[in-house]
């Protein structure tokens, strides 16, 4: 994929083409796919871990 910026900088030509940088998380996902996990699996596991570590609200907050 290529990102094209129009008039991003006055010193540059009208079209400036940039290659997006891959993020570290994608590299980790590719590494874990050999273990049978997809990137969606890893994101769901991360979300589940986040929810499990969230503090629960105290009961009867309204009254």
UniProtKB/Swiss-Prot annotation:
It comes from the Bacteria. This is Protein virE1. NCBIfam families: PRK13867.1. GO terms for biological process: protein folding. The gene is virE1. Pfam families: VirE1. Involved in DNA transformation; controls virE2 polymerization and prevents virE2 binding to DNA. Forms heterodimers with virE2 that prevent virE2 anarchic homopolymerization and binding to DNA.
């Amino acid at each position: 994929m290529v990102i094209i910026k129009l008039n991003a900088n006055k010193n540059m030509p009208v079209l400036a083409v940039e290659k997006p940088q891959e993020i570290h998380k994608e590299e980790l996902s590719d590494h874990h796919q050999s273990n049978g996990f997809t990137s969606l699996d890893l994101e769901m596991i991360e979300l589940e871990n986040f929810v499990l570590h969230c503090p629960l609200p105290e009961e009867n907050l309204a009254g």
